[in-house]
């Protein structure tokens, strides 16, 4: 899956993703996405961050390592964004593909959750790097209609994955708060 508002940064990015996808235990691979200003837009998704799911390291300089080098190293996550995502066709078919109940938001997180529920890994590939001109494809949630749709998608996700939301993201330290940016300790 690839948004029309992305641009490849490294010619080896697709080959790198394919390498992970060829491992039988891997179900999905996502890329590092970088804003035009050189900061990170996506380096993995944390389940429950900000309520449903949030991007790790958003706004961090793309050359920075981040907490325990997780922004700079390929590693497993609960989810990755579909703005640039590779999934073997057999895995995609096995889980029933994208859920049509999500017109815009959370379809990628839902797909990753379904893939993980089948025992596959979701991998963030830090070496597959793309520019992402976010919201050029989907726009912003800036009208009452879009906000109502977004609220409905939140409710759909919660009804389907509440148990997993309650249990917390297995790849995220429970000592970090879920209401602020990822990997930052809250002040008391």
Locations of the language-model features?
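Non-transmembrane alpha-helical segments in soluble domains
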Residues: 18, 44, 112-113, 154-158
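A short, conserved alpha-helix in the catalytic core of glycosyltransferases
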Residues: 14-17, 71-96, 101-131
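Short acidic (Asp/Glu) and glycine-rich catalytic loops that position anionic groups and cofactors
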Residues: 131-137
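Conserved donor NDP-sugar-binding/catalytic core segment of glycosyltransferases
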Residues: 6-50
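C-terminal, non-catalytic tails of nucleotide-sugar-dependent glycosyltransferases
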Residues: 27, 37, 49-76, 122, ...
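Short glycine/serine/threonine-enriched helix-capping/active-site loop
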Residues: 29-32, 125-126, 133
């Amino acid at each position: 899956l690839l948004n029309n508002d992305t641009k490849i940064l490294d010619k080896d990015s697709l080959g790198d993703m394919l390498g992970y996808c060829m491992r039988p235990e891997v179900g999905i691979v996502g890329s590092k996405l970088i804003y035009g200003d050189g900061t990170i837009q996506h380096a993995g998704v944390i389940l429950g961050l900000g309520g449903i799911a949030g991007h790790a390291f958003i706004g961090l300089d793309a050359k920075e390592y981040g907490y325990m080098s997780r922004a700079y190293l390929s590693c497993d996550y609960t989810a990755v964004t579909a703005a640039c995502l590779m999934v073997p066709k057999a895995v995609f078919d096995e889980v029933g593909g994208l859920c049509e109940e999500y017109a815009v938001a959370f379809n990628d997180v839902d797909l990753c959750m379904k893939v993980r529920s089948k025992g596959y890994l979701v991998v963030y590939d830090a070496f597959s790097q793309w520019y992402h001109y976010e919201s050029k494809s989907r726009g912003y949630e800036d009208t009452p209609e879009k906000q109502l749709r977004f609220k409905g998608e939140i409710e759909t996700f919660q009804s389907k994955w509440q148990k997993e939301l309650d249990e917390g993201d297995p790849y995220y330290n429970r000592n970090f708060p879920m209401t602020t940016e990822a990997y930052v300790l809250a002040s008391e």
